[in-house]
Amino acid sequence: MLTVFIEYKLDTEKRSHALQLLTSMAERMEAMGAHQYRSMEGLDQPGLFVETFEVETVQVYEEIKANRLADQDFCDCISGGAAKLHVWAFRPAELG
């Protein structure tokens, strides 16, 4: 199981549209194979968002990443566009 984080800062002028798009994001992400989707906004940095969810395979992660980076309507709401939509996957650390 991989944990995925998506991080971006919304363009202030496009915040309303982005929030409207985010209302259906959980459903869209689950349809692509994400589990336990959450979207959070920074307390100390309003407009900074992090989405997090779990996926079962690297392939699902890569498909979701490609899909999100190609989502021009949403990326247009991000300060800096798709280049500033950061997507990272993490696996459990093997300690000891």
Predicted regions and their residues:
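Glycine-rich beta-strand-turn "strand-cap" elements at beta-sheet edges
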Residues: 2, 32-50, 73-96
